[in-house]
Amino acid sequence: NRALLTLEEAGAYTGIGVHKLRNMCDQEGCKFVIWVGAKRMIKRKQLDEFLDNTYSL
């Protein structure tokens, strides 16, 4: 398993839509996104931890 996922891969992995993931990444203090140039990459471990501790999106 890769540590970094594209938005599309993260969507397939979690079942969350790409647009919702993009909105979540745009929130101040988002800890599961890293920018590689202009491309957003999702940190799988931090995304899992975020989802484990989140009641509602």
Regions found by a protein language model. Give the residues of each.
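A detector for short, charged/polar N-terminal pre-domain segments
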Residues: 1-3
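Major-groove DNA-recognition helix of helix-turn-helix-type DNA-binding domains
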Residues: 12-41, 48-49, 55
